[in-house]
Amino acid sequence: MEVLFEAKVGDITLKLAQGDITQYPAKAIVNAANKRLEHGGGVAYAIAKACAGDAGLYTEISKKAMREQFGRDYIDHGEVVVTPAMNLEERGIKYVFHTVGPICSGMWSEELKEKLYKAFLGPLEKAEEMGVESIAFPAVSAGIYGCDLEKVVETFLEAVKNFKGSAVKEVALVIYDRKSAEVALKVFERSL
């Protein structure tokens, strides 16, 4: 895990890190989930496997939590399902916050941006509500959902800048691969 950038945004310490989000020392990590919380690939699969040792089992746990927390089998943009981090608790990670970003398929619009903004803001608000002081995000929707990484990072930064809260002290964006992390770093440097 390498921290590439750190800055203060109000009372929040904002970081950009390159590495595996399941290794990041935050109280909550965010999962870029699909609306039915089926953790079949990408960061969702990696987080599910790290938490429960088996992605299928963690999918079942997540779906049960979604039914308990929302009374239905899907979540919308901005809604957050909270599950225990299980095996990751030994690393100090207590919760996984499941959020749903938009499917861009290479396109971008105000509507897609609004959905993505909600996907970033929702977990920040949930962290505030639960008194969680540190939270790490992946680049929601930048993988298989095909949103432009620069737009994703810009939207993430906008959500953090606009977030109003006092409990959350540290927010990180964790990017797995070096090339993408360098793209994100350029956005951080010109935005902060």
UniProtKB/Swiss-Prot annotation:
Coiled coil: none annotated. Keywords: Hydrolase. Its EC number is 3.2.2.-. GO terms for molecular function: ADP-ribosylglutamate hydrolase activity. Residues 1-192 form the Macro domain. PROSITE patterns: MACRO. Substrate binds at residues 19-21, 32-34, 39-44, 140-146. The keyword Hydrolase applies. InterPro entries: Macro_dom, Macro_dom-like. GO terms for biological process: peptidyl-glutamate ADP-deribosylation. Changing residue 41 to D: Abolishes hydrolase activity. It comes from the Archaea. It catalyses: 5-O-(ADP-D-ribosyl)-L-glutamyl-[protein] + H2O = L-glutamyl-[protein] + ADP-D-ribose + H(+); 4-O-(ADP-D-ribosyl)-L-aspartyl-[protein] + H2O = L-aspartyl-[protein] + ADP-D-ribose + H(+); alpha-NAD(+) + H2O = ADP-D-ribose + nicotinamide + H(+). Removes ADP-ribose from aspartate and glutamate residues in proteins bearing a single ADP-ribose moiety. Inactive towards proteins bearing poly-ADP-ribose. Catalyzes removal of a phosphate group from ADP-ribose 1''-phosphate (Appr1p), but with low efficiency. NCBIfam families: PRK00431.1-3. PANTHER family: GANGLIOSIDE INDUCED DIFFERENTIATION ASSOCIATED PROTEIN 2-RELATED (PTHR11106), MACRO DOMAIN-CONTAINING PROTEIN (PTHR11106:SF27). This is ADP-ribose glycohydrolase AF_1521. The lineage of its organism: Archaea, Methanobacteriati, Methanobacteriota, Archaeoglobi, Archaeoglobales.
